[in-house]
């Protein structure tokens, strides 16, 4: 069945495999998450569960979130996310999902918000080569021509231009789980994931994993 968790990126480190290989890993605090709501195909047209992560005081949340969580009979959470599942009837409102739902060797997709880098030029944002760095030229890091004049008399959509870099939703697919610490709700993922330290991430079964 499909499964997932909300987590928090704690940072990167490295571990050694049994054969001596050094493996770069990202440590994620995955859960515990509480099932707040169920959605079924009969009632809502699709099967999903809504989970909450990072409990907080009711005074720090708005009334809509407090009322929604109170209906579920659970505490108030800072983050609520919906996860598609094959069969929502396998879950009950109030169930606690922890890191132990995953196992070493599982392939997962991790979604997070990339680190924002502000307004950047085309060389940093898109990898343009740029002009000559020598003297006698005033064309160094400029984008150059962005289109023709009379025809088509416009700039095409999706033209690579300077602008905001980062701070967008990014998903990294098929990351392998190296180790699971169920006692501390920690998952070690092989490689890097988007976002800064303490950033919110969503961990789900990989859509491209071999069945």
UniProtKB/Swiss-Prot annotation:
PROSITE patterns attached to this UniProt entry: RIBOSOMAL_L3
Signal peptide start-end: none
GO molecular function: rRNA binding; structural constituent of ribosome
Pfam family name, one: Ribosomal_L3
One Gene Ontology biological process: translation
Keywords (A to Z) from UniProt: Ribonucleoprotein, Ribosomal protein, RNA-binding, rRNA-binding
GO cellular component assignments: cytosolic large ribosomal subunit
InterPro entries assigned: Ribosomal_uL3 (IPR000597), Ribosomal_uL3_bac/org-type (IPR019927), Ribosomal_uL3_CS (IPR019926), Transl_B-barrel_sf (IPR009000)
Family of this protein: Belongs to the universal ribosomal protein uL3 family.
Task of the protein: One of the primary rRNA binding proteins, it binds directly near the 3'-end of the 23S rRNA, where it nucleates assembly of the 50S subunit.
Record text on subunit structure and interactions: Part of the 50S ribosomal subunit. Forms a cluster with proteins L14 and L19.
PANTHER family: 50S RIBOSOMAL PROTEIN L3, LARGE RIBOSOMAL SUBUNIT PROTEIN UL3C
Name this polypeptide is given: Large ribosomal subunit protein uL3
Gene name tied to this protein: rplC
């Amino acid at each position: 069945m499909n499964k997932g968790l909300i987590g928090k990126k704690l940072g990167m480190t490295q571990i050694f495999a049994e054969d001596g290989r050094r493996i770069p890993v990202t440590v994620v605090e995955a859960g515990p998450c509480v099932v707040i709501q169920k959605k079924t195909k009969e009632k809502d047209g699709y099967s999903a569960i809504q989970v909450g992560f990072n409990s907080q005081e009711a005074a720090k949340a708005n009334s809509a979130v407090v009322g929604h969580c109170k209906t579920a009979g659970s505490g108030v959470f800072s983050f609520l996310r919906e996860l598609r599942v094959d069969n929502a009837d396998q879950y009950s409102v109030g169930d606690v999902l922890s890191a132990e739902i995953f196992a070493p060797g599982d392939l997962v997709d991790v979604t997070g918000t990339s680190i924002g880098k502000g307004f950047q030029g085309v060389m940093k944002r898109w990898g343009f080569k740029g002009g000559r760095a020598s003297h006698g030229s005033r064309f160094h890091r400029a984008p150059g021509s962005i289109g023709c004049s009379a025809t088509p008399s416009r700039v095409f959509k999706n033209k690579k231009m300077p602008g905001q870099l980062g701070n967008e939703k990014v998903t990294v697919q098929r990351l392998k789980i190296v180790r699971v610490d169920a006692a501390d709700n920690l998952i070690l993922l092989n490689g890097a994931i988007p976002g800064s330290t303490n950033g919110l991430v969503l961990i789900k079964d990989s859509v491209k994993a071999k069945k």
